[in-house]
Amino acid sequence: MARRPLVMGNWKLNGSKAFTQQLIAELKTELAEITGCDVAIAPPVMYLSEAEIALAGQSTIRLGAQNVDINTQGAFTGDISTAMLQEFCAKYIIIGHSERRTYHAESDQFIAKKFAALKTAGLTPVLCIGETEAENEAGQTQQVCARQIDAIINSLGVEAFNQAVIAYEPIWAIGTGKSATPAQAQAVHAFIRQHIAEKSQAVADQLIIQYGGSVNDTNAAELFSQPDIDGALVGGASLKATAFAEIVKAAEKAKA
């Protein structure tokens, strides 16, 4: 089945009020003609209000967020609930990013709880999975990805991946300038889809699987030419309007 591509920008810990306003103004101009690709941006949560205001009057670019908590309210200092994100019209919520897994010791099981919280709230989880360089060199890529996916399936069932997104981000390629070759990325994406298909072909067929890890305006077109790469989760290049727009346009063209 034809899957509509999704390109999402993860701003990480970058930006300011002025930066948010300026970048979104530039993106609105650059992406004004886009009709064949879904687009989302995830600024730091402090700038969601600024971003929501800046995005008013257009429907091409959707808001997302970089994190969510499993609790809905209460004594959880520094956390963000699904309801808070919904108030700013955030739709696509990143969970399981390797930086959260590494720096905040988030386990597969904890990430599964975040996934459940998002599904309950009607938000779209963008589940990041991927292996370290050591795991890659040891031939454990499929094993690691399967484990991270199975944490969701074992807790919520494979149907939880309906209207959800998986972002395959090999940790050795994030922010390093290294990127998996299109063939390498496609092989992992095909494995991910087949792993889901073993439980449900219908769920696998509709699942958006993004690639992340040093995606830029130079390598995007070749990555998107692969049949199981349905878009990208973009880091550094999402902070530059022209580069991010080129990635979106490459996805639209490749999947037309």
UniProtKB/Swiss-Prot annotation:
GO BP terms, alphabetized: gluconeogenesis; glyceraldehyde-3-phosphate biosynthetic process; glycerol catabolic process; glycolytic process
Pathway: Carbohydrate biosynthesis; gluconeogenesis; Carbohydrate degradation; glycolysis; D-glyceraldehyde 3-phosphate from glycerone phosphate: step 1/1
UniProt GO MF annotations: triose-phosphate isomerase activity
Chief localisation class: cytoplasm
Binding residues for substrate: N10, W11, K12, G175, S214, G235, G236
Bridged cysteine pairs (disulfide): none
UniProt xrefs under SUPFAM superfamilies: Triosephosphate isomerase (TIM)
Domain of life: Bacteria
Active site: H97 (electrophile), E169 (proton acceptor)
This enzyme's EC code(s): 5.3.1.1
Isomerase among keywords: yes
Catalyzed reaction equations: D-glyceraldehyde 3-phosphate = dihydroxyacetone phosphate
Family designation: Belongs to the triosephosphate isomerase family.
Classification via NCBIfam families: tim (TIGR00419)
Stated role: Involved in the gluconeogenesis. Catalyzes stereospecifically the conversion of dihydroxyacetone phosphate (DHAP) to D-glyceraldehyde-3-phosphate (G3P).
PANTHER family in alphabetical order: TRIOSEPHOSPHATE ISOMERASE
Identification of the protein by name: Triosephosphate isomerase
Organism: Haemophilus ducreyi (strain 35000HP / ATCC 700724)
